[in-house]
Amino acid sequence: MAATNTILAFSSPSRLLIPPSSNPSTLRSSFRGVSLNNNNLHRLQSVSFAVKAPSKALTVVSAAKKAVAVLKGTSDVEGVVTLTQDDSGPTTVNVRITGLTPGPHGFHLHEFGDTTNGCISTGPHFNPNNMTHGAPEDECRHAGDLGNINANADGVAETTIVDNQIPLTGPNSVVGRAFVVHELKDDLGKGGHELSLTTGNAGGRLACGVIGLTPL
């Protein structure tokens, strides 16, 4: 008598019950079904099949960014500036610069991260909106206008700046641009000097550093 085949489809997990039989048989299976013939089924009382879905790794993506700039100059002025930003919020800038003369010094973000010719080659203030120079709180200002930092009697300036015009991501990202600390006080565009509306008449460039991303 020719063996007959039975095709049973199942979904996972499932249990296939096979009645006893006196005819020898082999068992063949695949993902979509099970093929049985009637030979030797008496050796199998039940077969359990379970298909386990592949587990997916949980990936947590952080939108936080962190960057740093190390400032160097031709004088003894040097410093470190760190930047952090969470999601699309404002950027927090922590500044520590040493070797300054006591008092206020203009502190700006410049357009280029090019220091091949010293701080001069960093270009003008970062100004994607084509505004005139102003104070950080002014509506009309360069994005790179960060005001003044004040050095103490030891020549050390430490401050924290929170600003929403210097993001670490997006089309106006400041990564790859440069911070510059200046010789003089920034007049914030209100000094009436011919340079007030471009540089704040903040004088020479003492030190600069290019912004680069760092691990969180």
From Swiss-Prot:
Q: What keywords does the record list, in alphabetical order?
A: Antioxidant, Chloroplast, Copper, Disulfide bond, Metal-binding, Oxidoreductase, Plastid, Transit peptide, Zinc
Record carries keyword Chloroplast:
yes
Residues annotated to bind Zn(2+): 125, 133, 142, 145
Q: Which reaction does it catalyse?
A: 2 superoxide + 2 H(+) = H2O2 + O2
State where the transit peptide lies. Answer: 1-62
Q: Which GO terms describe its molecular function?
A: copper ion binding; superoxide dismutase activity
Disulfide linkages recorded for this protein, renumbered to the chain, are 119-208
Record text on cofactor binding? Binds 1 copper ion per subunit.
Organ and tissue specificity: Expressed in leaves (at protein level). The spatial localization is regulated by miR398-mediated silencing. Mostly present in flowers, old rosette leaves and inflorescence, and, to a lower extent, in cauline leaves, stems and roots.
CDD domains from the UniProt entry: Cu-Zn_Superoxide_Dismutase (cd00305)
Task: Name the cofactor(s).
Answer: Cu cation; Zn(2+)
Q: Which SUPFAM superfamilies match?
A: Cu,Zn superoxide dismutase-like (SSF49329)
Cite the EC number. 1.15.1.1
What would changing residue 164 to K do, according to UniProt?
Answer: In strain: cv. Cvi-1; enhanced stability and better tolerance to photo-oxidative stress conditions
User: What turns on expression?
Assistant: Upon photosynthetically active radiation (PAR) (e.g. light fluence) increase and UV-B treatment. Accumulates in response to ozone fumigation, during recovery. Induced in response to oxidative stress, via a reduction of miR398-mediated silencing. Repressed by sucrose in a miR398-mediated silencing-dependent manner. Repressed by salt stress. Down-regulated by aconitase.
Subcellular localization is given as: Plastid, Chloroplast
Write down any Gene Ontology CC term. chloroplast stroma
Q: Any idea which positions bind Cu cation?
A: 108, 110, 125, 182
Q: What class of enzyme is it?
A: oxidoreductase
Q: Which GO terms describe its biological process?
A: cellular response to light intensity; cellular response to oxidative stress; cellular response to ozone; cellular response to salt stress; cellular response to sucrose stimulus; cellular response to UV-B; miRNA-mediated post-transcriptional gene silencing; response to copper ion
- Give the phenotype of cells or organisms lacking this gene: Growth retardation (e.g. delayed flowering) and abnormal chloroplasts (e.g. less organized with fewer stacks). This phenotype is reversed under very low light conditions. Enhanced tolerance to oxidative stress.
Q: What does this protein do?
A: Destroys radicals which are normally produced within the cells and which are toxic to biological systems. Mediates tolerance to stress, including photo-oxidative stress.
Q: Spell out the family assignment given in the record's similarity comment.
A: Belongs to the Cu-Zn superoxide dismutase family.
**Subunit composition and interactions:** Homotetramer.
Q: What is this protein called?
A: Superoxide dismutase [Cu-Zn] 2, chloroplastic
Native species of this protein? Arabidopsis thaliana
> What is the name of the gene encoding this protein?
CSD2
